[in-house]
């Protein structure tokens, strides 16, 4: 059986990933593609408990290395229990954030550096990398204003200062420059419908290639 495709969505707080995830699901359904929708951190019962630890308040503050290791602990469980089984069944997997977020948030944002994240990535994932990453690129100020406008209590990350998110944004930009074939930038500072149109165009381009057999895993 042919392994399923692995698609990830990335972006800062307020980038619109939840809405984008719905559009991706709807597009794949129209193509008759069986897709599993999931998220990180989380995606499994244990992963969701780790998510609560990561997003909840921590006093004294959680150490950056602890944060990174918890992210990869949740990811390891997610891969073992949900992502790999689905891919091996031939299902496609669409994940709200994956390891690019660890590079951006812990590698750049927390200052741990890409080398440490890469070591955890190789150990946890082996050779598995997403086939396509849709990066919803939103200016920091715009994203944080949108997140604040949801009217929900901010989580531990959303309470960070703007400088943290500027570093995270720099991380995503560096990754997009390094992996231009995999990471497709979508300007998420546009009006919503324009964002979703651009997102679907980037997705459709990749899906068309895959379904035509012109691009192997």
Swiss-Prot record:
Q: Enzyme class, one word?
A: transferase
Entry EC number(s): 2.7.4.9
The record's CDD domains line, in alphabetical order, gives: TMPK (cd01672)
The name of this protein is Thymidylate kinase
Q: Which UniProt keywords apply?
A: ATP-binding, Kinase, Nucleotide biosynthesis, Nucleotide-binding, Transferase
Q: What is the species listed in this Swiss-Prot or TrEMBL entry?
A: Alkalilimnicola ehrlichii (strain ATCC BAA-1101 / DSM 17681 / MLHE-1)
For whether the record's keyword set contains Kinase, the answer is: yes
The record's GO molecular-function terms, alphabetically, read: ATP binding; dTMP kinase activity
Biological process per Gene Ontology, one example term: dTDP biosynthetic process
């Amino acid at each position: 059986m042919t392994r399923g495709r692995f698609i990830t969505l990335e972006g800062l707080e307020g980038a619109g990933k939840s809405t984008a995830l719905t559009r991706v699901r709807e597009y794949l359904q129209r193509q008759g593609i069986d897709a599993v929708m999931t998220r990180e951190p989380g995606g499994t019962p244990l992963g969701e408990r780790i998510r609560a630890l990561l997003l909840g308040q921590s006093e004294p503050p959680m150490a950056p290395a602890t944060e990174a290791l918890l992210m990869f602990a949740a990811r390891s469980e997610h891969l073992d229990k949900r992502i790999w089984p689905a891919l091996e069944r031939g299902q496609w997997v669409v994940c709200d954030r994956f390891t690019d977020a660890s590079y951006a948030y812990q590698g750049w944002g927390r200052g741990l550096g890409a080398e440490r994240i890469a070591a955890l990535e190789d150990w946890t994932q082996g050779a598995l990398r997403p086939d396509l990453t849709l990066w919803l690129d939103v200016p920091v100020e715009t994203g944080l204003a949108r997140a604040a406008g949801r009217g929900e209590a901010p989580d531990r990350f959303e309470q960070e200062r703007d400088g943290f998110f500027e570093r995270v944004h720099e991380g995503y930009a560096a990754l997009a420059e390094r992996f231009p074939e995999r990471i497709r930038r979508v300007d998420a500072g546009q009006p919503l419908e324009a964002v979703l149109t651009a997102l679907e165009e980037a997705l459709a381009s990749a899906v068309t290639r895959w379904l035509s057999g012109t691009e192997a895993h």
